[in-house]
Regions:
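Hydrophobic transmembrane alpha-helices of multi-pass small-molecule transport proteins
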Residues: 53, 75, 81, 106, ...
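Specific alpha-helical transmembrane segments that line the substrate/conduction pathway
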Residues: 40-51, 80, 89-123, 163, ...
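Glycine-/small-residue-enriched transmembrane alpha-helix faces in small-molecule transporters
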Residues: 1-40, 79, 83, 87, ...
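Specific transmembrane alpha-helical segments of multi-pass solute transporters/efflux pumps
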Residues: 21, 25-26, 54-104, 140-141, ...
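Helix-helix packing/entry segments at the starts of transmembrane helices
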Residues: 42-44, 100-106, 174-196, 229-265
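Transmembrane alpha-helices of multi-pass small-molecule transport proteins
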Residues: 33-83, 108-114, 166-173, 188-206, ...
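Juxtamembrane helix-entry segments on the extracytoplasmic side of multipass membrane proteins
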Residues: 7-12, 34-39, 43, 66-71, ...
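Membrane-interface helix-cap regions at the ends of transmembrane helices
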Residues: 2, 20, 24, 35, ...
């Protein structure tokens, strides 16, 4: 499929579905943390998710190559991916789903700002700047909930925010290094395989592993590994290869909304009018960010 300068209905639908899955993922990770140490969960999830991705590539004859100059940036991205999710999983151990989701999905702000300076075709115009400001306001409104503040951990907040920086860095590396020569499947495998290679030996050395594992926790773990990580991120990298990074990433502002919703649904975390307002602001912000430049 050819590159596009704006996001059409099909692309928007995929991004919204992906945002729903990511919002749900925050709650699922917190549940699985009860049965697995956070670091172990990151490593074993990467390993389990890599298997169906490899099978998919073999069945559909997707190109998997390290001879295109992508090996070094791929290893770096895989290392960043490992650190990103270790930080996020610990954040979910320390703070509420709502708060960690809101901070983690601030990623489009850092990505949009960096893309403005790094990519000539992704300059921020007045409408997009206003859109970003409105979206940031939406995140701020959601964070202003008294329940979020009282249940929050400063260290957990910092971990979630650092994880969002790493997510933006990975996206930029895909755009700016030889990783862009790799297929979306290969880009994902770099991250899954490298993170598994780094983390699993580390957890064995440190003695981190299973906690109070149950059948239901195993089912949830498999769902997030196979559906959210394997299938979801394949879609994410494919969309990244078609649509402008700053525009598609703006849809991640739906992430904290769905994260807060599932936090309320699963953990009974408080939801209020501020969440409804933040959803409205996010919708307006995304509309402005996706508006085309006019002469």
């Amino acid at each position: 499929m050819n590159k596009k300068n704006s996001i059409d209905f099909f692309g928007a639908s995929l991004l919204v579905i992906f945002s729903i899955l990511l919002g749900l993922n925050q709650s699922l990770v917190k549940i699985v943390n009860l049965g697995m140490h956070p670091i172990f969960q990151v490593g074993i999830r990467s390993l389990v998710a890599a298997i169906p991705v490899i099978i998919f590539c073999l069945l559909f004859k997707k190109k998997l190559s390290i001879s295109d100059g992508s090996l070094i940036p791929g290893i770096i991205c895989g290392s960043l991916f490992a650190l990103e999710f270790v930080l996020l999983f610990f954040a979910l151990e320390l703070t509420s789903v709502s708060r960690s989701s809101i901070l983690f999905y601030s990623m489009p702000v850092w990505l949009g700002i960096c893309a403005h300076f790094l990519f000539e075709e992704e300059k921020l115009n007045i409408k997009k700047i206003i859109g970003f400001l409105i979206s940031i306001a939406a995140v701020t409104i959601a964070m202003s909930s008294k329940a979020n503040i009282s249940n929050g951990s400063v260290l957990g907040d910092i971990f979630a925010l650092l994880a969002s920086f790493l997510w933006a860095t990975i996206i930029l590396m895909v755009r700016m290094t030889n990783l862009k020569k790799s297929t979306p499947e290969m880009q994902l495998l770099y991250q899954l395989v490298v993170s598994a290679i780094i983390i699993l030996p580390l957890t064995a050395y440190l003695g981190f592993g299973l906690r109070d594992i149950t059948i239901s926790i195993m089912f949830i773990f498999l769902f997030q590994s196979l559906i959210i990580v394997a299938a979801g991120f394949l879609i994410w990298f494919w969309v990244l290869s078609i649509y402008p990074a700053s525009l598609m990433a703006s849809y991640s502002f739906f992430g904290p909304i769905f994260g807060v919703f599932f936090g309320w649904l699963i953990f009974k975390e408080e939801i209020s009018i501020t969440i409804i307002l933040s959803l409205l602001f996010v919708s307006v912000g995304i509309y402005l960010i996706n508006s085309k430049n006019t002469n």
